[in-house]
């Protein structure tokens, strides 16, 4: 199996929740090419699934050392820092990710960062700005629905979920939220 095939297989295994086999693939990738970020990135994502946040950060550190301009890596590491409540590191990585790649997931993680740090109004305002900037991003509508629902605004939440369903009629999560 080639490097690319092992990389693809590693992510397939990760999505199937076969974390042991996926980790084996990550380690094989690292041995095949220790100068490539892919093996370390896959390992970091596996560690996130296992809630091994410190280990994931170590893996992402290695990947970032190889690819320092990869915004996705900063987003992944920022999310791990967020789960450890390492505020400064998380915010810096999420902002770096946005600066490098403007990833929608990094913006959503920044919303979570604001929420976890007690800035609910800032999180909502930021998310409203994201919805205005990219109204076709279904996940932003769903996240806003979740925030409204959590805040006890069920009717407002419903409108956000309905908007998400207009754009993605197959979205089971949004459908389930409306049915509940």
Spans of model-derived segments:
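Helix-start (N-cap) detector for alpha-helical repeat units in TPR-like alpha-solenoids
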Residues: 3-4, 37-38, 71-72, 104-105, ...
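Alpha-helical segment of the N-proximal tetratricopeptide repeat
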Residues: 2-38, 42-51
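Structural signature of tandem alpha-helical TPR/SEL1-like repeats
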Residues: 16-24, 50-62, 83-96, 117-129, ...
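Short coil turns that delineate tetratricopeptide repeat
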Residues: 34, 68, 101-102, 135, ...
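Terminal, low-structured helical/coil segments at or just beyond the last alpha-helical repeat
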Residues: 1, 143, 150-180
């Amino acid at each position: 199996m080639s490097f690319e095939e092992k990389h693809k297989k590693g992510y397939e295994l990760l999505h199937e929740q076969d974390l042991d086999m996926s980790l084996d693939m990550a380690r094989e990738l690292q041995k095949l090419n220790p100068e490539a970020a892919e093996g370390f990135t896959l390992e970091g994502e596996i560690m996130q699934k296992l809630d091994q946040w410190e280990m994931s950060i170590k893996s992402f550190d290695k990947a970032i050392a190889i690819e320092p301009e990869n915004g996705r890596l900063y987003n992944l590491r920022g999310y791990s820092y967020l789960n450890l409540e390492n505020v400064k590191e998380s915010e810096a990585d999420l902002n770096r990710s946005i600066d490098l790649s403007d990833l929608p997931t990094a913006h959503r993680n920044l919303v979570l960062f604001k929420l976890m740090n007690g800035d609910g109004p800032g999180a909502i305002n930021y998310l409203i700005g994201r919805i205005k900037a990219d109204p076709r991003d279904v996940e932003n509508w769903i996240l806003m629905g979740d925030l409204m629902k959590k805040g006890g605004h069920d009717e407002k939440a419903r409108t956000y979920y309905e908007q998400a369903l207009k754009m993605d009629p197959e979205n089971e999560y949004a459908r389930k939220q409306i049915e509940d």
